[in-house]
Regions:
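Loop/turn positions that initiate beta-strands
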Residues: 366-368
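Terminal amphipathic helices with adjacent charged low-complexity linkers/tails
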Residues: 116-135, 257-292
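Long, K/E/R/D-enriched contiguous segments that form extended
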Residues: 280-346, 350-351
Length: 368
């Protein structure tokens, strides 16, 4: 795969290519997991820099050991807090041309790691996708939570956002973070294996028109449940929608708006780069949310207590990492409200215990 990738450098006139762990929605549950395809690294955070004659993998302190085990044969491993990509690039006499997918980076994240020691070349057609068609499509539809279970209606949340726009004199706002769309519309889905956050984005205008971008078949269950005029579009229609919107300015989120979308919006509107106000709105929990958090903590605590009792009274010589992981989830499944684990269980025995975010598999599985 790496050699095939490097063969494309000449066509695009680049000296290297960047592959982050995240996907277009900045999710750690990347679909496709391009970083794993290239490097075999399976951790939740990381980034590869592929140059013509050398390959680098940057991870945080949790994953240095895991990265060496999974990717050390073909990659030079660096802890990103100690060595950044721009430090590697600064050693070259002439600035290298480094290609990247603008859908996978914000301006903030790219500049922090790479500038000023290279020339960045945006390539819209992802080079890994050209070599490997791996995206798994999820056919399950979105669903909306009952406002009684979350403590606030969608109408109320949208009104709060409209009031914010009015005070800040914002004509249009782009909510690019799926978790904020999820909060704003009380929306959930099945796009990610360990999270109910649906992959979607939205635009809200000061005239209260809402444009929701997602696969159209996924929104069939919610079309008539959002108390506002909603226009549903595929993501490929984004530029078409931008051109029909009115107003002079657009607010985008500096944390989650990719370079790709920022460029499309800036072709017609003056951009205000701010932090999405939904981050602030949702950080203040209402009484129902607080009660539900407490209830969830107690219910999960019951499952964990039963698990600890079980393991204390078991013959540990007969147990291994996978059996322990399965048993813990079985206790959690007894709760009628249980959906799935929020992250993979970390059950490491012996040397596996030194791998901070270890996940057992048939090959690595050890006795307890």
């Amino acid at each position: 795969m790496i050699n095939k990738l490097k063969q494309k450098f000449k066509r695009y006139e680049i000296d290297g290519y960047i592959i982050p762990k995240n996907d277009e929605f900045f999710s750690e549950y990347a679909n496709p997991n391009r970083l794993k395809i290239v490097s075999n690294f399976s951790g939740s955070a990381g980034m590869a820099l592929i140059l013509k004659d050398k390959n680098y993998l940057f991870v945080d302190g949790r994953y240095t050991l895991q990265a060496k085990l999974e990717s050390g044969k073909k990659f030079k491993i660096h802890e990103i807090t100690k060595v950044k990509p721009k430090q590697i690039l600064s050693k070259f006499k002439n600035k290298l041309k480094i290609g990247f997918d603008p859908k996978l980076f914000t301006n903030q994240s790219l500049k922090k790691q790479f500038l000023p020691h290279c020339n960045l070349i945006a390539i819209n057609d992802n080079l890994i996708d050209q070599l490997s068609i791996t995206k798994k499509l999820n056919g399950q539809k979105f669903y909306q939570l009952n406002s009684k279970d979350v403590g606030e209606t969608t109408r109320s949340k949208i009104s709060r956002l409209i009031n914010y726009m009015s005070k800040k004199k914002i004509d249009n706002i782009f909510i690019s973070a799926p978790e904020n769309v999820s909060w704003l519309l009380n929306l959930r889905g099945y796009d990610n294996p360990n999270s109910p956050i649906p992959n979607c984005r939205l635009i809200l205008s000061k005239s209260r028109e809402l444009y929701l971008f997602s696969s159209k078949y996924k929104i069939l269950n919610i079309r008539n449940k959002i108390p506002l005029k909603v226009n549903y579009y595929e993501e490929n229609d984004f530029y078409f929608v931008i051109n029909k919107l009115k107003g002079n300015n657009f607010s985008i989120d500096e944390i989650s708006c990719s370079i790709y979308f920022e460029k499309l919006i800036s072709s017609k509107f003056y951009i205000n780069t701010k932090v999405d106000p939904c981050y602030y709105f949702k950080s203040i929990k209402n009484v129902i949310e607080l009660n539900n958090m407490e209830k969830a903590h107690i219910e999960d605590g019951v499952a964990l207590t039963k698990f600890l009792y079980w393991i204390k009274n078991s013959d540990v010589k007969k147990l291994d990492e996978l059996k322990v992981e399965k048993k813990l989830e079985n206790f959690r499944k007894r709760n009628k409200n249980y959906l799935y684990p929020s992250f993979n269980t970390i059950a490491g025995s012996g040397p596996n215990g030194a791998i901070i975010h270890y996940r057992a598999n048939k090959k690595s599985n050890r006795k307890i």
